[in-house]
Structures are given as C-alpha cells and as structure tokens.
C-alpha cells in the first residue's frame, strides 16, 4: 500500500507537514517505510521580572521576543515477520536530520539597583544549529513457548549537534559587548528489556529485567570568557529487575509487584572524574492495584512508584548568555525524579471521579541564584529540590450522550504544599 499525507497549519506563520508511507505484506511478512518533512516556526513574547538580593537588591525587567525556524527530515524503514499466531520478530531503523535550524532572540532590559535605574540594555542573539543525523535502531521479539510468554526489545540511539550563538549587546551606561559561543554535543543510548510471563496459581507471574546505558559529551566555549567554558562527559548505567503477580479473585482483580533499580553515574570535567558529582544508588519500588465492582460502580485503587529521568536538554553543560545580568545554564548533575502515586478512580455510567496524591522526591524546578557571591549576575538553571514535593488532585468528569451529540465536561483541582526558604 501507499499513502500520502499533507498538512497545512496557519497562524501568525505557516507550518507544513508532508509525509509518505509505503507498506508491503505477504503471508507473515510486513515491510514498511516512511519519509516525512516538517517545516515549523515558533514565536514567543515574554515579560520577565527577576529580583536578586545580594549586597544590594537587583531588579531585572526583561521583554523577550523569540523566533524559531526548523526544518526536519525524518525517515524509517523496517519489517515485521510473524512465524505463527504466537511468535513474531521485527526491526526498524529510523533516521532524522535538520537542513535548517536557526533562532533569534531579542531582549530589552531595564536594570535597577536598590530601586534606582542602573542600566538599560538591548540584546540580539542569533543561533544556528548544525544537527548531525540522528540514528535509532529497534528490534523486538514476542512469542510463546508452551505456557511461557516472552517479550524482548532492544534500542540504540545516537544524536548530536553543533550550535553557534552570536550576541550583540548595547548598554546605555557601560561598554557594549559582542559574545561568541559554541556548543558541541553528542549523545548515545543503548537499552534492552526482557519480560517472561507464566501462569501460576490461577494468575500470571511475570519477571524481567532492563538495562540502559547513556553516554553524553557536552563541550561549551565562550571566546570572550564572559561565561566560563567547559568540557564535560557523563556515563550512566541503569540496571533494573522486576517481578509482578496478577490474579482475578471473587471480589475483584489485583496486581502485586516490585522493581529493583541500580544506577551508577559518572561525571567527568576536562577528562577528570569528579567524585563529588558522581554517584551510585540502589532502590526498591513496590506497586499494587486492586479493582472491583460495587453494584453499578466500577472502582480501582493503586499505588505505584515511578522515576522520571531529566531530559538531555536539562542535562546540557551549555550556557545561554541572555545579557550581562542573566545567564541560563543546564545542570549535568540533575538526579531523576522519584514519584510515589496513590490513586483512586470510580466510574458510574457517564460519570468518573478520581482522587490522587503524589509525593515527589528530587523534583526538578527552575531556579535562580547569584553566579558569584559578590556579583550582580543571575544564574538560571534547573535543580533538584532538597525536600519532597506533595501534591493532591481531585477531578470529576462527565461524558453524556445527548441525541447525536457526545458532550464532555471536566472539573478539577490540584493543590501542592511547598515552602522554599530564600
């Protein structure tokens, strides 16, 4: 089969998505390929007020205009083969590249010290990014040998880019600046997962393991040294083992499980291993759920613990020079968030009610602090909270059918308790 899809989006600008798919099937063989072109523009207007209390109180009032232009080429090719109704294998190779990726940032800043105007700045930053081809390879096998179910998949991912930033800064009270910066980033990830399931005591028992290895190289250079240059490297090994048992009983269905996770993180700066920022730790996370029916009401209660890894962007060692009073930076030492979730859901006809409580450890937040103790420069970056972040949410939704119409209404509230001493 063959399929062509073209999408046109009109707002302040024009966005385009063009995609072609081809597919061939014969007996148990399924072969496929895809090619896609994306043209996207992004515009943002933001007003930001920042206050830094040091020897004096620094107030920054920024007006930012950001324009982003991207063109992406994506493609994949692969095959699936079904030996019989219980056993199949597959492989897919994906590639992605960007012939054009540039952005422009215009910033107008008013700077005050102890309530008196200290300076006014006009900044223009032009960024050009040369993206390397991103490669991803995935292979899987799902099958059954007797009563034993097997699910295996493996992935490899590679990406990288070279970005050059040029900033021109005009000051009413101080010298003007030209800032030249470059970032060279390379990412590699390999992962594999195996799950084995077998019927036990009228239920199903599953065991498995997962392995993930991540390598990242991140070099940043500022020619004028307004922002410190840096060369860093990160290696992370994650090994997970898990087990789960599920069964239906007279009063409902339940699932009991646990996951063991071992993480080893090594951080290098200028090819030297940094012991204080490297770490390894072990954790065990349980999960349990139970669902049943009480009359016409379906209900479920569950408890899970999940980890959320910080993105490559947050882990970046690169810096963004906004102006001489504001610098944005990544944080390569961010830890994964660990969230404990307790949820209850009930549904009756077209009504659904849900209550949830979350407790997040190492929550990632956006943070500002002095770049140096005696300087009036704000360093903006993501950090891990040193205390747990509790959150409660409650939602009710209705989706009744009225004639030919299906209406949906949702009401909810989310409440968090967090106090930060500054």
Across the structure, where does each feature detected by a protein language model lie?
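Signature of Gram-negative outer-membrane beta-barrel scaffolds
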Residues: 206-293, 302
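Surface-exposed, low-complexity loop segments enriched in small/polar and acidic residues
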Residues: 98-123, 136, 151-184, 209-227
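Outer membrane beta-barrel strand-and-loop segments of large Gram-negative receptors
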Residues: 189-193, 230, 234, 238-240, ...
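Extracellular loop and loop/strand-boundary signature of outer-membrane beta-barrel proteins
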Residues: 5-7, 58-65, 120-127, 174-182, ...
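Flexible, surface-exposed loop regions and adjacent strand-edge segments
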Residues: 48-56, 106-116, 167-175, 222-228, ...
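Extended amphipathic alpha-helical scaffold segments
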Residues: 165, 264-266, 412-413
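Membrane-proximal, glycine/serine-rich, low-complexity loop/turn segments characteristic
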Residues: 1-108, 126-160, 186, 190, ...
């Amino acid at each position: 089969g063959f399929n062509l899809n073209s999408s046109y989006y009109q707002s302040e600008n024009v966005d385009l998505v063009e995609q072609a798919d081809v597919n061939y099937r014969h007996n148990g063989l399924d072969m496929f390929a895809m090619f896609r072109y994306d043209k996207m523009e992004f515009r943002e207007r933001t007003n930001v007020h920042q206050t830094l209390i040091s020897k004096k109180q620094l107030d920054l009032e920024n007006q930012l205009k950001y324009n982003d232009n991207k063109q992406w080429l994506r493609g994949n090719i692969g095959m699936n083969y079904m030996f019989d109704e219980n056993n199949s294998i597959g492989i897919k190779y994906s590639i992605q590249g960007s012939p054009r990726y540039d952005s422009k940032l215009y910033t107008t800043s008013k700077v005050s010290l102890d309530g008196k105007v200290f300076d006014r700045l006009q900044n223009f930053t032009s960024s050009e990014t040369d993206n390397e081809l991103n490669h991803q390879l995935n292979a899987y096998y799902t099958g059954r040998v007797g009563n034993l179910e097997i699910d295996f998949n493996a992935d490899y991912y590679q990406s990288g880019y070279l970005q050059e930033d040029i900033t021109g800064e005009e000051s009413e009270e101080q010298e003007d600046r030209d800032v030249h910066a470059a970032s060279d980033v390379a990412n590699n990830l390999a992962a594999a997962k195996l799950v084995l399931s077998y019927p036990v005591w009228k239920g199903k028992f599953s065991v498995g393991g997962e392995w993930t290895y991540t390598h990242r190289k991140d070099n940043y250079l500022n020619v004028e040294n307004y922002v410190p240059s840096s060369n860093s490297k990160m290696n992370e090994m994650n090994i997970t083992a898990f087990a789960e048992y599920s069964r239906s009983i007279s009063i409902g269905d339940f699932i009991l499980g646990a996951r063991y996770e071992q993480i080893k993180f090594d951080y290098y700066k200028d090819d030297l291993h940094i012991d204080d920022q490297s770490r390894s730790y072990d954790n065990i996370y349980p999960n349990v759920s139970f669902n049943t029916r009480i009359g016409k009401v379906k209900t479920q209660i569950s408890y899970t613990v999940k980890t959320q890894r910080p993105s490559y962007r947050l882990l970046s060692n690169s810096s963004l020079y906004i102006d001489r009073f504001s610098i944005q930076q990544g944080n390569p030492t961010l830890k994964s968030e660990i969230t404990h979730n307790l949820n209850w859901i009930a549904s009756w006809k077209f009504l659904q009610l849900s209550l949830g409580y979350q407790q997040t450890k190492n929550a990632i937040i956006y943070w500002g602090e002095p770049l140096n103790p005696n300087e009036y420069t704000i360093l903006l970056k993501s950090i891990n909270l040193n205390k747990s972040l509790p959150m409660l949410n409650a939602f009710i939704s209705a989706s009744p059918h009225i004639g030919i119409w299906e209406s949906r209404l949702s009401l909810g509230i989310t409440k968090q308790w967090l106090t930060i001493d500054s």
